[in-house]
Amino acid sequence: MKKLIILIFSLLITFNVLANDWPHQNISKAVFALDIKDRAPINIIEELDNSLGKIYFFTNIRNLQGQRVTHRWIYKNKVMADVVFDVGGPRWRVWSSKNLWPTWIGVWSVEVLSADGEVLYQKEFNYNK
């Protein structure tokens, strides 16, 4: 019995450590990338040169099956796009993309919203000259 309790305690600590590495309790990964291949982000970035006109936002969603999430693209406090996803399983990978004009330089953000509009996570990137 003592060994079982130690095992359970160890597993709980391990899970807690892993969960704390996630950006949000329901988001295990959220990154900007230059491309998506085989449902995975390729060339993860934090900023983008304005000679490149497209960026992807990839999110690995956990334990929200049956719910909807939205990627909301924001530039200069203006909503530029909402992309809605239906989450079909306990681990669901989604991504959206945005075509960018070279003049739209500055800080962009993407919010990951729950179905009721709660911001689950927000991430920024710089679009530079």
Residue ranges and their predicted role:
Residues M1-L4:
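Positively charged n-region of N-terminal signal peptides that target proteins for export
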Residues N20-S51:
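Short, compositionally biased P/S/T/A/G/V-rich stretches that sit at domain boundaries
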Residues H71-Y75, V112:
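Conserved aromatic beta-strand anchor motif in extracellular beta-sandwich/beta-rich domains
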Residues G88-S97:
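Aromatic sugar-binding surface patches on proteins
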Residues L100-W101, S109-Y127:
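Short, exposed beta-strand-loop hairpins at the edges of beta-sheets
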